[in-house]
């Protein structure tokens, strides 16, 4: 199974963002990817006051990525988008997965919301405008069990242990918009930790660059193997990186170091 992580600089123009995402998906398909992952909020990343009308799963964004997956014959984890939420004040931060035929295979709503107040540095209250999801999701991608997550979920290892131990995940995907000041110190460390402790591949696709005054995303999208080794990583700027997932290596690691089987708690 060949996976691609697609790194994007989404801004405040939904149509331009979708067009840029499509170019990255085409590059992933040209590189032989079976599965491509896009970043968090692929539809819009700009001032909250200018956010376009949130949509249902079968709205413009969902329909666009369904068509792209079908045209390219490739599985697509369409990052995440602003799904119409439970009330007028809240959206859901939702990841959609489409199969090669463009059919919706799974959807996941971000569970852990980024509520942070660091005086003089950052103030962000995601829960003010986003409702949390409640259900972990694992989807079967042609025999590869893929656990879904979004950005801030990465800091909560309990979710990933559940995806691996109860959901049987082989691959954990992380569409993200990790901020620069935390990404520099934590992004790679957390991704490699989730891979090692759950003996899973991890594919993380991040937003990159400036998006609005005061918000810069770290990028550095990567694929990590179950031993915690980085198989591929992107530098700054939009781009695509591909890696082949060796499931025989995954099985060997789990057999030689059976930490999942040895759990007591």
Indicate where each model-derived feature is located:
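Short, acidic/polar
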Residues: 15-27, 156-163
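Active-site catalytic loop in hydrolytic enzyme cores
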Residues: 54, 86-166, 179-189, 256-259
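Short polar catalytic/cofactor-binding loops
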Residues: 7-14
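Cys-nucleophile CN-hydrolase/nitrilase-fold catalytic domain and related Cys-dependent amidase chemistry
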Residues: 14, 23-101, 107, 116, ...
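CN hydrolase (nitrilase-like) catalytic-core segments centered on the catalytic cysteine
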Residues: 57-78, 145, 154-241
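Extreme N-terminal starter segment of soluble prokaryotic enzymes
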Residues: 1-4
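A short C-terminal boundary segment appended to hydrolase-like catalytic domains
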Residues: 248-265
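Short beta-strand scaffold segments in enzyme catalytic cores
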Residues: 78-80, 94-97, 137-139, 221-223, ...
